[in-house]
UniProtKB/Swiss-Prot annotation:
GO terms for biological process: negative regulation of cell growth; negative regulation of G1/S transition of mitotic cell cycle; negative regulation of protein neddylation; positive regulation of apoptotic process; positive regulation of protein neddylation; protein neddylation; regulation of cell cycle process; regulation of protein neddylation. A lipid is attached at G2 (N-myristoyl glycine). The keyword Amino-acid biosynthesis does not apply. This is DCN1-like protein 3. Contributes to the neddylation of all cullins by transferring NEDD8 from N-terminally acetylated NEDD8-conjugating E2s enzyme to different cullin C-terminal domain-RBX complexes and may play a role in the cell cycle progression by regulating the SCF ubiquitin E3 ligase complex, after UV damage. At the cell membrane, can promote and as well inhibit cullins neddylation. GO terms for molecular function: cullin family protein binding; ubiquitin conjugating enzyme binding; ubiquitin-like protein binding. Keywords: Cell membrane, Cytoplasm, Lipoprotein, Membrane, Myristate, Nucleus.
Length: 304
């Protein structure tokens, strides 16, 4: 899984503010002044007569069809405010600090330095939250777009700004709908998109399940992970359906598994898990019973 299992604007940033409208032109000019301006702008004013093109008269162009050039060079785009320009500049400097020399992205080495400056371990839950907010496509990598869009999403443009967002991100992840979105993102995040993977390797899935449930560890999780760990030969990978349905499983099935039914539409791997866990508990109970039995008055260790 590499050195990291995840991928990350100053709280005072102000993005998207607008400049004021252009002051209207003065109305004190006379007709003569207006006429003079028209003569100076023949392309947008009204011509004095018909225009000859190759000796043929051509109808004069309608004044409304002409447009004056704008000082910005792009009439449809509003100029950025000073605050937004400053924020984008800080983001650019931050991105360049960690980006790869050959690729316009933050890769594993840069990610480690980024996490070190944030005072977080690359394998911890807070880094997964950043990857979620950045909508990172793969582990240990932030593209330029992911980094800029992600920092804007959390309104931070500096290391201190990102660190200041961690408490609110941790709180947000406790909301049921937000956690569901984070949970589903985590599956896609764990896939190797370059190889076109459609299922998670067993070891990656185990690590990501432990990570994503950092703040909310369901009672059945440890039993499930033990099952996956002790049955490596029978479990090659975890499909998206199995991953998504496990969240439902933790919400409706109790830790004793007594309300589980094979007749319901659960993935077949869940049937195998419940059968395996029930058998394990049966053997465990029989073992305890054997230790407690024996000749009356003798402890198990005193029997020969």
């Amino acid at each position: 899984m590499g050195q990291c299992v995840t991928k990350c604007k100053n709280p005072s940033s102000t993005l998207g503010s607008k400049n004021g409208d252009r002051d209207p032109s003065s109305k004190s000019h006379g007709r003569r002044s207006a006429s003079h301006r028209e003569e100076q702008l023949p392309t947008c004013g009204k011509p004095g007569g018909d225009i000859l093109v190759n000796g043929t008269k051509k109808a004069e162009a309608a004044p409304e069809a002409c447009q004056l050039p704008t000082s910005s060079g792009d009439a449809g785009r509003e100029p950025k405010s000073n605050a937004e320009e400053s924020s984008l500049q800080r983001l650019e400097e931050l991105f360049r600090r960690y980006k790869d020399e050959r690729e316009d992205a933050i890769l594993e080495e840069g990610m480690e330095r980024f996490c070190n400056d944030l005072c977080v371990d690359p394998t911890e839950f807070r880094v997964l939250l950043l990857a979620w907010k950045f909508q990172a496509a793969t582990m240990c990598k932030f593209t330029r777009k992911e980094f800029f869009d992600g920092c804007k999403a959390i309104s931070a443009d500096s290391i201190d700004g990102i660190c200041a967002r961690f408490p609110s991100l941790l709180t947000e992840a406790k909301q049921e709908d937000k956690f569901k979105d984070l949970y589903r993102f985590t599956f896609q995040f764990g896939l190797d998109s370059e190889e076109g993977q459609r299922s998670l390797h067993r070891e990656i899935a185990i690590a990501l399940w432990k990570l994503v449930f950092t703040q909310n560890n369901p009672p059945v999780l440890d039993q499930w992970l033990n099952f996956l760990t002790e049955n490596p030969s029978g479990i090659k990978g975890i499909s998206r359906d199995t991953w998504n349905m496990f969240l439902n499983f933790t919400q409706v099935i109790g830790p004793d598994l007594s309300n589980y039914s094979e007749d319901e539409a659960w993935p077949s791997l869940f049937d195998t898990f419940v059968e395996w866990e029930m058998e394990r508990r049966k053997r465990e109970g029989e073992g305890r019973g054997a230790l407690s039995s024996g000749p009356e008055g003798l402890c198990p260790e005193e029997q020969t």
